[in-house]
């Protein structure tokens, strides 16, 4: 909360710093009390029982404290010394229900200032890593000037053991692995309605929460540090995308770089999910993209293509809108997001050609029609 100091590793941002004095006056104290007054007078939402059940699971994992009453929280932090974020549920693809802290509604996001914005690896990192391995082999083992040979000739001199693959790992409950600073614990509190107690309860979360703006930047510092150590100490060609680690390596290395990256993470206090481990191989689904490296040595090619399931999803959504003749701004936003991600894996991002009309519909005025216009029809037909 308040001003987040820069780590010096991400892109700098111009910022109007929120001072501790401003935070105490405008967010904590009487303002916090007013906000809590508003929460405790709210009726329970339709998801109250589900939220309470999910909270019990989080408590059992040791990620948070036990539910406390308002009086108990006041006794611990003092009146006006804490401020909660109401919880709601976001249902993800596949039906998974995730607890989200409403840090926007709680005012937490507004009262946060940051000096930097994060960056993450692009999927093309894998091709760059494979090219680096080929380039280093060329420098070390082929005659001087071999880098200027025609591609076919250069490829004919590459050994089989230079075959490359990629392995993937994912952190377990990643945000919860990043502890909250003790000074900020009073604002890293979530609120939910207990159907058993028939009253609002408040819980201190010991790790980062989904929904708080600063959580994303704060969390990403850890995998970036881990990646830097794995690269410099173990020469592991790994890259992080939030809580995902993707490691390029020679297949004959039998996953040693991937294993070393996991070892570094463990030494730093992190944990990977064994059920999400994907061993190093020439074909891999990475960040939702099908990556193929088996043609690298024969044709000098690394392929990136959208998963078949993603393509079918885009086609089905576009077809449904065309058949109904309507498209809401929310539906346009969802289709645009999915199609834009897939388009990033096409040559020249050609798939983006049909997305302008979806963007126009996404941001249209509230009083405008949801009917499919001629421009939107053309865009949907392109995607279908």
Predicted regions, residues:
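Nucleic-acid-interacting cores, centered on viral/eukaryotic replication and modification enzymes
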Residues: 1-384
């Amino acid at each position: 909360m308040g001003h987040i100091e820069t780590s010096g590793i991400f892109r700098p941002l111009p910022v109007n710093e929120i001072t501790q004095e401003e935070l105490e006056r405008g967010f904590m104290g009487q303002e916090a009390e007013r906000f809590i007054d508003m929460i405790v007078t709210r009726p329970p939402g339709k998801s109250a029982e589900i939220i309470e059940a999910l909270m019990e699971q989080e408590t059992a994992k040791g990620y948070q404290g036990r539910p406390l009453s308002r009086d108990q929280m006041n006794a611990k932090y003092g009146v006006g010394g804490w401020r909660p974020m109401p919880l709601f549920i976001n249902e993800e693809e596949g039906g998974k229900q995730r607890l989200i802290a409403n840090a926007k509604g709680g005012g937490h996001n507004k009262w946060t200032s940051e000096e930097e914005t994060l960056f993450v690896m692009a999927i093309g990192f894998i091709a760059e890593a494979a090219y680096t391995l080929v380039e280093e082999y060329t420098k070390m083992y082929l005659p001087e000037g071999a880098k200027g040979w025609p591609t076919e000739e250069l490829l004919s001199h590459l050994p089989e053991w230079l075959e490359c693959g990629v392995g993937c790992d994912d952190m377990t409950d990643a945000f919860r692995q990043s502890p909250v600073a003790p000074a900020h614990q009073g604002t890293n509190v979530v609120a939910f309605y207990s159907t058993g107690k028939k009253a609002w309860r408040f819980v201190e979360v010991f790790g980062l929460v989904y929904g708080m703006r600063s959580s994303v930047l704060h969390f990403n510092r850890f995998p970036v540090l881990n990646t830097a150590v794995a690269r410099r100490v173990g020469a592991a060609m790994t890259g992080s995308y939030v809580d995902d680690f993707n490691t390029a390596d020679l297949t004959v290395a039998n996953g040693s770089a991937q294993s070393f990256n996991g070892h570094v993470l463990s030494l730093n206090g992190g944990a990977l999910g064994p059920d999400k481990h994907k061993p190093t191989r020439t074909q891999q689904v990475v960040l939702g993209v099908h990556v193929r490296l088996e043609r690298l040595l024969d044709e000098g090619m690394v392929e990136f293509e959208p998963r078949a399931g993603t393509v079918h999803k885009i086609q089905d959504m576009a077809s449904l809108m065309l058949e109904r003749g309507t498209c809401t701004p929310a539906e346009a936003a969802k289709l645009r997001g999915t199609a834009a991600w897939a388009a990033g894996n096409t040559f020249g991002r050609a798939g983006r050609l049909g997305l302008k009309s979806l963007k126009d519909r996404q941001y249209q005025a509230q009083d405008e029609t949801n009917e499919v216009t001629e421009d939107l029809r053309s865009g949907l037909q392109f995607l279908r």
